[in-house]
Swiss-Prot record:
One of its GO terms (biological process) is menaquinone biosynthetic process. Its EC number is 6.2.1.26. It is an enzyme of class 6 (ligase). The keyword Cell cycle does not apply. It catalyses: 2-succinylbenzoate + ATP + CoA = 2-succinylbenzoyl-CoA + AMP + diphosphate. This is 2-succinylbenzoate--CoA ligase. PROSITE patterns: AMP_BINDING. Converts 2-succinylbenzoate (OSB) to 2-succinylbenzoyl-CoA (OSB-CoA). The gene is menE. GO terms for molecular function: ATP binding; medium-chain fatty acid-CoA ligase activity; o-succinylbenzoate-CoA ligase activity. It comes from Enterococcus faecalis (strain ATCC 700802 / V583). Pathway: Quinol/quinone metabolism; 1,4-dihydroxy-2-naphthoate biosynthesis; 1,4-dihydroxy-2-naphthoate from chorismate: step 5/7; Quinol/quinone metabolism; menaquinone biosynthesis. Keywords: ATP-binding, Ligase, Menaquinone biosynthesis, Nucleotide-binding.
Length: 485
């Protein structure tokens, strides 16, 4: 029996899903899903186990996810900001034959000749629910999301139903989520932060209010009027909500915000505390199916700056470069182990990320205090997190260095008031090339959020003793010595 069916049996008339001015109970969700199942049965072969989805947040995407899971399909979630080249790589790497896209994406998708493109449009017919019900198998792959990693080569993360289930249970225990909660989802469903909210709904029986895009005015109005008890945010969203925070505050039913997706300025958290907004900082990634370390509501004010403690059944340790466990307050690499953590990447990429005894090497640096609260020092050392999106410098550097006229490139993150951080590029040219030419190539090969916001020409790069680029010097006044003026 699927998670949706269980909720229908328990609470058929309980509110389940809100989108714009529409609402559905769990029973009504199941009835709507039956139409979508019938639609996709007409275009997908039973033996086709993997399907790609390409859409911004919509009710159609939500129902498509549930319908395709009912049909036992593995779902490849594609970021709608990807360029044609990036889409092509992921579709080929995942060996997907069919991509289901929102109507507004059809023109772009028609340029991809090696897949069958199907519109995300429901057809008006239905089947008996028992005819298409699939037995749930927690070992099955539920979703695939690509993450670039430090190599710049995107890797498909294989997220199984058991990983999602453990994540939902851990969140329930940490945050006290019940069927009476309504989780506001203004983050993309193609990100783990968004999809995990759908899983929590199915597992815990809470309702979801989905937004097609984040609008701080609309979210604020909904929180004022009691239309949501919890919301997931990244730093950029939190800043925007603070800018329009009403004098009267939010509804008494509001529990708090779950903050993820990168660093936030301590003064913003202090503002939240002053206004009485509970904010739970958390730590997680695509490979852990959302947060695996988080604060509790009661600890939020006492442990500002900490990502919290491990959630239910999760283990964490800090090790040095030799793999030896570090004592408290000693910085080292963060290793994770537990049911939330995936067991591998698609096509067996980078198996060395997992130790022989099952620990996942995050590549992130941090330390634990005496009470085992985690403090992050850096994320993948060079990872740039901009508005909740991960940008891996290596990926951007590879695009820049493929441009005729660029001999070398280095990309770093610079602090930004709006986005938290933005990518900035330093290049060495070996022939005449203009800034406009570089920007044109970046716009063709990189999603908008990955494109360098500033590009500087250099005569040379600072180097370490071993000959590597000393990128940290680009983040100080020392960079002036290497720029062409």
């Amino acid at each position: 029996m699927t998670w949706l069916n269980k909720q229908v049996q328990k609470r058929p008339d309980h509110p389940a899903f809100y989108f714009q001015d529409e609402s559905w109970t769990f029973l009504e969700v199941q009835q709507e899903v039956s139409h979508w199942v019938a639609t996709y049965q007409q275009v997908l072969a039973p033996e086709e186990k993997r399907v790609a989805l390409f859409s911004k947040n919509s009710k159609e995407l939500y129902f498509s996810i549930l319908a395709l899971w009912e049909l036992g399909k593995e779902l490849l979630f594609l970021n709608t900001h990807l360029t044609l080249a990036e889409l092509t790589f992921q579709l080929k790497d995942a060996q997907v034959k069919t991509i289901i896209g929102a109507p507004e994406t059809q023109a772009l998708l028609e340029e991809i000749s090696f897949v069958d493109v199907q519109p995300m449009i429901k057809k008006q017919h239905s089947l008996s629910h028992q005819e298409f019900q699939q037995p749930s198998d927690l070992e099955s792959v539920a979703s695939i999301m690509y993450t670039s990693g430090t190599t710049g080569q995107p890797k498909g993360v294989l997220q199984r139903f058991k990983n999602h289930l453990a994540s939902a249970r851990g969140t329930q225990e940490n945050m006290g989520i019940t069927a009476e909660d309504c989780w506001l989802c203004a983050v993309p469903l193609f990100h783990i932060s968004g999809l995990s909210i759908v899983v929590r709904q199915l597992v815990l029986g809470c309702s979801i209010r989905l937004y097609d895009k984040f609008d701080e005015q609309q979210v604020t109005q909904d929180l004022q009027e009691g239309r949501g008890t919890v919301i997931s945010v990244v730093a950029t969203m939190l800043q925007q909500l603070l800018s329009v925070y009403p004098e009267a505050g939010y509804s008494a039913s509001f529990k708090g915000m779950l903050l993820g997706g990168g660093p936030i300025a301590p003064d913003k958290l202090a503002q939240c505390e002053e206004k009485g907004i509970p904010v739970i900082q958390s730590y997680g990634m695509t490979e852990t199916c959302s947060q695996v370390v988080a604060l509790k509501f009661e600890d939020a004010a006492l442990k500002i700056g900490s990502a919290g403690q491990p959630l239910k059944d999760m283990q964490i340790k800090i090790v040095d470069e030799l793999g030896q466990e570090q004592p408290e307050k000693q910085v080292g690499e963060i290793l994770l182990k537990g049911p939330n953590v995936v067991s591998g990447y698609l096509n067996q990429r980078q198996p060395e990320k997992w130790t022989a005894d099952g620990w996942f090497k995050t590549g992130d640096m941090g330390y634990l205090d005496a009470q085992s609260y985690l403090y992050l020092v850096s994320r993948l050392s060079e990872l740039i997190i901009s508005g909740g999106e991960n940008i891996y410098p290596t990926e951007v550097e590879q695009v820049l260095q493929a441009i005729t006229g660029i001999k070398a490139a280095a990309v770093v993150g610079e602090p930004d008031a709006q986005w938290g951080a933005v990518p900035v590029a330093y290049v060495i040219s070996d022939q005449e090339i203009t800034l406009a030419q570089i920007q044109d190539q970046c716009s063709r090969k990189l999603a908008k959020y990955k494109r360098p916001k500033r590009i500087y020409f250099c005569h040379s790069f600072p180097q370490t003793a071993s000959g590597k680029i000393a990128k940290h010097r680009f983040m100080t006044e020392e960079r002036e010595a290497f720029l062409i003026r």
